[in-house]
Amino acid sequence: MRTKKVTGLTMLFLALIATPLWGQSYQKTSCGIKANVCSMNVEVQFYSPEIVRIIKSPIGTDFVKKSFSVIKTPEETDYSVREQNDCVVLKSKAVEITLNLKTGKVAYADAKGNSLLTEKDYGTQFTPVAYRECETYLVRQAFMLDRDEAIYGLGQLQQGKMNQRNQMVHLRNVNSTICIPYIQSIKGYSVFWDNYSPTTFTDNPMETAFDSQAGDCADYYFMYGENADGVVRCMRDLTGQVQMNALWTYGFWQSRERYQSQEELLDVVKKYRELGVPLDGIIQDWQYWGTDQKDWNAVEFGNPLFPNPQKMMEDVHKMNAHIIASVWPSFGNNTNIYKELNSKNLLLDFKTFPESAKVYDTFNPEARNIYWDYMNKNLFAKGMDGWWLDATEPEFFDNDDKLNQKTYAGLYRKVFNAFPIVSVGSVYDHQRAVSSDKRVFILTRSAFAGQQRYGANSWSGDIRSTWDVLRKQIPAGLNFSICGIPYWNTDIGGFHAYTYPDGIKDPAYRELYVRWTQFGTFTPMMRSHGTSTPREIYLMGEKGAWEFNTLEKYKNLRY
């Protein structure tokens, strides 16, 4: 073996060429830098002067990340790069980003150097995990917040909290809970954790962290908007602008679980017109397809009590009102849509509602095309004005292992929380492709970050009719809207009225309903709905009764 003698001069030369500190540990890219730190690939990407993306992955991990939420691509941004001790510092006109090349920690400051947020040292963790044949990681990212710093967001939660400090929240979409891994700080920044698997958010005195059940990388966006409006602007710049709904959708909506016939639905509109009380929308809930569970969600009128649905819609329109109907993502095994999806292996396998039904694989473009085809030919072409996409979580009543089945987009566990935005977005895009005569209107029970670009109006699910639940809707709606999605509402009066067995005959329930109506007047969609008892205004008393007069007054405020 040949050796070389290394002199002191040679050693000095080697030391000098290594002087650029960590200059060889990172490289510049078109929108930021790349580095290898702590056995991780780390990328810092400027999407704008105010928006920065951080991607970390174990070295050697081969993956392609498709975001269901983010539609923005990096814009040309002026920024500087300098080395400082063990760190590299990137600075735009809005923010300063410091990456520690020893620990992988990323810290954020404004352009003046005022600290905004910092990751924990070694706060990014990947734990290998296998779900059936799919090998992936449990992914964790931890941050350090100021002790008295308030944060908001995380979607529509029912725990009654506005400030999400000192909370542990399981972010998995279910009925009445919409989970968005996004927080906004009173310091004028926000963080969007771009992961769709069930995730646990934890905040305690030691850390603020996102722990996701599946992912190939830690992927999040830091946005600095200086104030709440500025941060929401950044989120919409990143995930899409809000669509303006048609004017009529901002009027009053009447619904119940359910109108049992074509005649009953039309009579409701007629009575509102006779009373001179404003009404813009009427909603047909489930079982217009029939009452046998095998015919569940046939996406067509099959109930003999709705003998002429096209004429029904025409009659609604003649009374200067609009109609939408309930469509679910699950289908009974006797329906044509079930048979077509099943023949092409486009159904997912887990217990849902009802148990005899199966949910379609919304991530598969062929399944989405079939879904819309039935909606279009059986409903939209007959005059339907919009869509009530119910249970878009979708409802999952099975063991945890069923999350490990494959979808078109990969492991279901990896993409679970993205189901609503894909399903809702597909209906929006399909209708736009078919016709520009009507603005798309969608009411839906679940959501994910970015859903505002489809103009969808989310509601808070099947909540109970109590004063405490009404109180909890205020922080639920505010924290949801803070995530960049403005269209939100609740079932006025609460969905489940079994707390009041006598329903509208009980003065106590009527008072709750009236107060809930006053709240609902100032939400983006004013919609009366529920089970157990009807809620039409003319059933609350005669004109002159305080309940009737108050309800009429607040309905008129919408106009």
Residue ranges of each PLM-predicted region?
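Bacterial Sec-dependent N-terminal signal peptides
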Residues: 1-25
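Generic recognition of long tandem-repeat/solenoid scaffolds
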Residues: 31-37, 54, 86-93, 106-109, ...
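Catalytic-domain carbohydrate-binding cleft regions of carbohydrate-active enzymes
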Residues: 114-559
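Broad, structure-driven detector of short, well-ordered beta-strand segments within folded domains
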Residues: 42-46, 95-100, 191
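Short, surface-exposed loop/turn motifs at beta-strand boundaries within globular domains
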Residues: 26-30, 35-39, 47, 83, ...
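A low-complexity, Ser/Thr/Gly/Pro-enriched, surface-exposed linker/loop concept
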Residues: 26, 30, 45-88, 126-129
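Hydrophobic or amphipathic alpha-helical targeting/insertion segments
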Residues: 94-118
